[in-house]
Design a protein with these regions (language model features):
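Alpha-helical membrane-protein architecture signal
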Residues: 259, 263, 287-292, 383
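Short, charged juxtamembrane terminal tails flanking transmembrane helices
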Residues: 407-412
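Short hydrophobic helices that act as membrane-entry/anchoring signals
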Residues: 5, 9, 29, 167-182, ...
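Non-transmembrane catalytic domains and loops of membrane-associated enzymes and transporters
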Residues: 47-284
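N-proximal low-complexity "stem/linker" segments adjacent to membrane-targeting elements
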Residues: 1-68
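Membrane-embedded multi-pass helical conduit in multi-pass membrane proteins
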Residues: 9-13, 27, 31-35, 41-44, ...
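Short, solvent-exposed helix-helix connector turns and helix-capping sites enriched
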Residues: 84-86, 288-292, 405
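Membrane-water interface at loop-to-transmembrane-helix junctions
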Residues: 219, 286-299
């Protein structure tokens, strides 16, 4: 069956207009809600907290920095040696912490399960062994809790690295995530509480962490590899509790050691995100966390696929014009074909152009948001950091195409 060319023009304009409108709404929402100050109505919370840290073959110097920062919190902490003992035990015990040695490497989730059994406090901070937290971070995070809050995450930044092709894209990736999460936090439902540093009510997550649903999650009939942070956040959201991002607590974490590892991390995050998105549609949780949460999820996970489809559609139209009219006139005729649209579309030419102008404004707004709090090397940050945009697009498409291959972690 031959599809009429006019129909393809209509389809292109309708879809591209829809994407432009949704992108503008998303970006302007981030600009408005993400810049609002946090509501300060629960600052008297002083509940007790334990910090739980799984460790596996971590860089000793970085682990030492992590434990030193934890020691300054003046709160109990437990480190689970996941198939590793010295020198981590010495570092932990020298700083007044408790070290639990597991002979076998049971994975991060397994180590978390062993650790949560030993936590008796009202709150628990889950902290990665390569993450450094500021003084009083634990106290400030639990002060964000009210009776309706189940989890609070810290803002994450990347520890500066000499490899600019890894550091700047990694920092850009984190910044894009934080911009979105800040806006979602305003509504009390974030997509992910960053796994590097987040605080939860112990009573809400203890049984879940010990459950098979957390330790051995399944997708498409087989065991899947998915981030513990996505599972925990989805669990808290599903219980009806708020999940929020603390904008005044900044934890710094180690980036990926090479560009190849950064790409693999992006694939893992994308694949985990799509699995969570599909499961959210299947169990209905996608539509139970408020309009902005649902809109953000649908926009973020359909955008790469729609963008690829529009690229293919536009390329097909251009190829068709070149074949019919000749390669020399192809480019000019392709442009003219969108200005001499069939009469049925005459009424949408002006609004279509107006929407494109709004889209340009929204892109400029996004760039402003990205560089707003970048104090140094803004040009370098944008130029090197923008590499991650292409990586995110390509890895998202690859993640969709390889959803069935979800049993490998890819990065450590």
């Amino acid at each position: 069956m031959i599809i009429p060319e006019h129909f393809l023009y209509v389809l292109y304009i309708v879809l591209s207009t829809t994407v432009s409108v949704c992108s503008s709404v998303y970006i302007f929402s981030i600009f408005y809600f993400g810049r609002k100050k946090e509501r300060d109505n629960h600052s008297k919370n002083t509940g007790n907290i334990t910090i739980l840290i799984p460790v596996y073959n971590e860089d000793v110097g970085l682990f030492n920095r992590c434990i030193s920062s934890v020691n300054k919190q003046s709160t109990p902490f437990i480190v689970i040696g996941n198939g590793c003992n010295l020198p981590y035990r010495e570092i932990v015990e020298d700083n007044g912490g408790r070290f639990v040695y597991l002979r076998d490497n049971v994975g991060k989730k397994g180590a978390m399960a062993e650790g949560i059994k030993r936590v008796n406090s009202e709150y628990v901070m889950l902290l990665d062994s390569d993450t450094v937290i500021p003084k009083n971070a634990a106290k400030r995070l639990i002060q964000k809790f009210d009776t309706e809050t189940g989890g609070v995450g810290a803002e994450i930044k990347i520890i500066k690295d000499s490899n600019k092709f890894v550091y700047y894209p990694s920092e850009m990736l984190q910044k894009l995530r934080q911009l979105s999460f800040k806006a979602m936090s305003h509504f009390g439902r974030v997509l992910v509480l960053n796994g590097q540093c987040a605080v939860y009510r112990t009573g809400l997550i203890r049984d879940f962490i010990l459950s098979r649903e957390f330790l051995e999650p399944r997708f498409l009939g087989k065991k899947m590899v998915i981030g513990d942070d996505i599972l925990l956040t989805k669990h808290i959201n599903g219980m009806g509790y708020k999940t929020i991002l603390a904008q005044d607590v900044i934890a710094r974490t180690k980036g990926q050691g090479s560009f190849k590892k950064l790409v693999k991390q992006s694939i893992r995050w994308s694949r985990s995100g799509y699995i969570n998105f599909i499961k959210g549609i299947k169990d209905g949780s996608l539509f139970k966390n408020g309009f902005f949460y649902s809109f953000s999820m649908i926009y973020v996970y359909t955008l790469p696929v729609l963008t690829l489809f529009l690229m293919v559609l536009r390329g097909g139209l251009l190829f068709n014009i070149i074949v019919r009219r000749g390669i020399l006139n192809g480019g000019r005729l392709f442009i003219l074909s969108f200005t001499h649209i069939p009469r049925i579309l005459n009424s949408v030419i002006f609004p279509y152009a107006g929407i494109k102008i709004i889209s340009i404004i929204s892109v400029v707004t996004m760039i402003y948001l990205i560089i707003e709090k970048t104090e140094k090397n803004r040009v370098r940050f944008l130029s090197y950091g923008s590499i991650i945009l292409l990586v995110m697009f390509l890895t998202a498409i690859y993640a969709v195409m390889s959803l069935n291959n979800h049993d490998k972690w890819l990065t450590r």
